[in-house]
């Protein structure tokens, strides 16, 4: 499995891997390539402990936990659960043009990952919402 990841990395000429599953820190480190570890954040989760388990991560993507859904649900989570991190934070989950500025001000993430919050309907982006989102991020 480690060799499969390495080979895919080489073939696709990737710069970074983003792990969204139950990969252990040992597995991520054994691959030996730069990576972002994603966590689906839920109430009561000890996110500090989870982040600390991955000292070699290049960053962390934090999204809302929704049972039975891998992500992209449009659901948010309590940003107060986000601890300081040794690596950059990418914030996802329930982001919209109306809360993008608050997300930046409160969390100070390296990046925002938005999907459903700028859609007209599932899978269809709204150019106006996208422009409003970008304006909120810049101002």
Where are the regions that the model predicts?
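Active-site beta->alpha loop and helix N-cap motifs at the rims of alpha/beta catalytic domains
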Residues: 1-16
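Short loop-to-alpha-helix "cap/lid" segments that border enzyme active sites
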Residues: 11, 22-139
